[in-house]
Amino acid sequence: MMAAFFFAFFVALVLSDGTTGTTASVMTMEARIYDDADLSQFYQLLETSQVANNTLTYRHVTVFAPTNRAFQKYNGSKSNLVLYHMSNLPLTIERLGLSVSSELDGNPPLWVTRKPGPTGEEEVFINNAKILKQHSNFQSKIKVNGDTKTQVLHVIDEVLEPVRSISPESPIYNPDAFQFINQSENFNMGNHRVRTFRQRIVIEKKEGIFTADGRYTFFIPVDEGFKPEPRPQKVDHLVIDGHVIPNHILFTVPTPENVYYETLVFSDNLKVTVSFLMEHNKVYVKSNTIVGDASHHTGVVLAEIVKPNIPVRNGVIHLIQRPLMVIDSTVKDFLESFKGIEKEDGPVYKFYETIRDFGDDIMTTINRLHDVTLFAPSNAALEEPGVQHILQDKRRVKEILNLHYVKQRLPLEKIQNKSISQAQAGIPTAADRKKLYFNVVQGPAGNQTITVEGGGVNATVVTANIAATNGIIHIIDRVLGVPYTTVLDKLRTDPMLNSTYFLGQRRGFNEQLNDTTKRFTYFAPREQAWSGANISYPSTIKKLFMQDFSYHTKQILERHLVVADQVYTMAKLREMSINESVTLTSARDTLKLRVKELSESYQIEWEGKWIRVFRHDVECTNGIIHVIDGVFLKDSDVRVTGDASLASFAPHLIIFLIAKWLL
């Protein structure tokens, strides 16, 4: 009833002859909001605010109106909330600057962020709320005592939440970051307290960086994150600087992931950057000490943002779970930090859960090691159906878990080093005779992607260099050792097998390798194997790569492929050929091999030649690949391939001669 009265009264003003001192265009701001059913909750706030009504009646204004869906997600106070969504300047999207003063007491700023959208169009945010452009830039004009007042409406997808003082005796309006920290008990922060960090700021005399005018992003650790006890003393003046990003106001939604921002501690002697990470609807912040010193070690520290997007006069504050830059936890401590119901969507919680359920002894072993690198699969990787199936096999799970750590420190910089990423021998893991192999892929923009292969599975490092006192943790996007590709897909995507894949495309040889009803054992020559064969048989290899000789290429590849009702691991082949050769049925004829084990690798003998198995037991969903350092070529192949055109023409010639004789 009241809404109808309010609307009728306002329309009367619109249609008046000017005696009230106010006239307007056909549709006023208030009428536009009233007319939009998706803004009904915001309209209710307008109705109850006399100040907002007066602003709409007499003044220039820009209104940021949250949708009803935005209010459904909002559980904060609505007292005077509407004034924080209004500014006394009429600003279209194009005219929005870096900030806008709101009409709330103290005129706290609303911060503006512009960023490119997924399709290239510009997106604009007010604090953490996105402006819905298709519903925005509505303008109306009213006349007040002869002056024209312009009013602009923007619709946003999130309610803007101001900093509110809960002390009626001494209210605080529009605080800067230090006022917020210093008077944190007087603000609504839920159960979070920041006394310890405040104490460190005062002791280190760093108040100035939190009171300075400008545009800053502040990360404030809560008291809970300062355990165990020695941790507070490690937060010195440089660590405090590492919690502040200058010249950027970074709210969580508009800030892209994995973009590195320089902190206040960024000099020749010490360099620290900060970036954001999203995981299961939680936001994490990562400090990366790129250049360290004796007191500040290199590496990444990961902290959950427990209360984000607190706007202050000189920027934005995020309350975080623990201090950045402080490396005082073991690898085991890092994994166990995700214990508890509230941590079950932490970035590697499911991996921790798997170790807890299947590999307690592995956790004990890792904790004893002074130098360890753990490759921890993300939650999404462990949710894959193929992984869930394997989790039923306890023995297999233990073997897979052992594949995910090595007994040395491998920070990203060391992996990027050619000697590691191109190391032919691989890096031994805790799994029996299993190694990890690394590859550095250069992106078009100069960025590098690091991949790790273990048990035939290629995984990408998505979060690197999480530092611990006894090692490094890298978060990867797949579970190593759990096949998810067919033999064909593995050939297609592994750069080491490019030539073998290329040759197999001739005459449809590769097509069979996608058949999941069969079990393949493929002795696949790697790139260096073809290069070596080119030295021994230059003419033959040259012809094999020519289309005219594809018939012979297919025959030679068939010699490398065993199709059976089972796969043959190198351990199984070694067992089968302890005292004699083993004969397998290849796709072409028979394949007679002997196998011997040397240290942690294997060699196979074929036709009197010993060939090293460069990488054994690369598992696929329909078979297994043994990457070998040689090609199964015979002298007779050289003679036969001497004239491929004759071989392909011979059957036609015989038929022609028989037909002629019969006639």
Q: What label would you give each PLM region?
A:
Residues A3-F7, L13-L663:
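Mature, structured domains of secreted/extracytosolic soluble proteins
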